[in-house]
């Protein structure tokens, strides 16, 4: 079953979202202190600065990841769409888990591997290039999986959850953050992730709305746009244009969006 066959499922995301876009983000852009300074300004005390996470990850989100995943020392955690690895590495350190990060951006994977030693011993983390719906991991090899703000990038969202159902051991949990939207004008809006999750073979255990998700994200976009000259000078036009595009395209739609955190489980 694909997206188009599930009630509430949607068409693929914008075609211009590519691995190359994320290579710029995880490479040139992420190496600038500008981005993390602006994130601190937007999120304030809720921002876990050490992670340098691209997603809208807060201390609240990290706490829910810990409680939802229920993973312990020596177990295998998968960080799906890991980017530069901040979320997965923090969780591996906090829980004692063995981490595998998967991302479609080679630059993100390289940066995650380079940062790993800041969080855990070298043997506790590995990172591979792979797709949201085709990780390359062995069946039933993971005790838990997490994905921060990325499942919506998949061309076939159902396939993401089917891949998690394949990779997770029976009873293991997959916790992810995303947004839901009631905007009838947006062909890429997901009004409800539950039917997509279940079509992929997982069970929804809980859905929570992320506190201040809309306000904090708008604050970050406003900060980017207010400092665009500094961003152009520090990052270059191409990377700055990526940020402007996101802020100007997504910002006006936030009134229709709700940030959500789902805890799901393999049967």
Which positions does each model-derived feature cover?
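Conserved beta-strand signature within the Rossmann-like core of class I S-adenosyl-L-methionine
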Residues: 172-179
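Class I SAM-dependent methyltransferase SAM/SAH-binding core
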Residues: 76-80, 84-134
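Conserved alpha-helix/loop element of class I SAM-dependent methyltransferases that forms part
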Residues: 38, 55-73
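N-terminal, positively charged/glycine-rich alpha-helical extensions of SAM-dependent methyltransferases
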Residues: 1-46
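A short glycine-rich, Lys/Arg-flanked "PGG" loop and its adjoining helix->strand segment in the class I
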Residues: 158-170
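Conserved Class I S-adenosyl-L-methionine
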Residues: 208-267
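A short SAM/SAH-binding and catalytic strip from SAM-dependent methyltransferases
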Residues: 144-156
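A short acidic, Gly/Pro-enriched loop at the edge of an enzyme's catalytic core
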Residues: 133-145
């Amino acid at each position: 079953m694909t997206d188009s066959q599930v009630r509430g499922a949607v068409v693929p995301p914008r075609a211009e979202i590519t691995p190359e876009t994320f290579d710029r983000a995880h490479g040139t852009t992420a190496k600038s202190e500008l981005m993390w300074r602006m994130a601190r300004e937007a999120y304030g005390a809720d921002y876990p600065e050490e992670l340098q996470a691209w997603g809208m990850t807060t201390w609240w989100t990290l706490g829910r990841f810990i409680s939802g995943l229920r993973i312990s020392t020596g177990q295998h955690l998968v960080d799906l769409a890991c980017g530069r690895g901040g979320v997965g590495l923090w969780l591996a350190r906090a829980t004692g888990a063995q981490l595998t990060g998967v991302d479609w951006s080679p630059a993100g994977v390289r940066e995650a591997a380079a940062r790993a030693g800041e969080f855990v011993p070298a043997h506790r983390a590995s990172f591979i290039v792979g797709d949201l719906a085709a990780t390359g991991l062995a069946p039933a090899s993971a005790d838990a999986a997490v994905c921060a703000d990325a499942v919506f990038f998949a061309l076939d969202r159902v396939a993401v959850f089917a891949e998690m159902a394949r990779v997770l051991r029976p009873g293991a949990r997959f916790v992810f953050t995303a947004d839901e939207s009631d905007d009838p004008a947006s062909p890429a809006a997901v009004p409800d992730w539950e039917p997509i999750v279940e079509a992929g073979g997982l069970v929804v255990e809980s859905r929570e709305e992320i506190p201040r998700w809309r306000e904090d994200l708008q604050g970050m976009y406003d900060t980017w746009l207010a400092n665009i000259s500094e961003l152009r000078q520090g990052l270059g036009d191409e990377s700055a244009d990526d940020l402007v595009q996101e802020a100007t395209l997504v910002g006006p739609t936030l009134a229709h969006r709700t940030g959500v955190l789902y805890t799901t489980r393999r049967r």
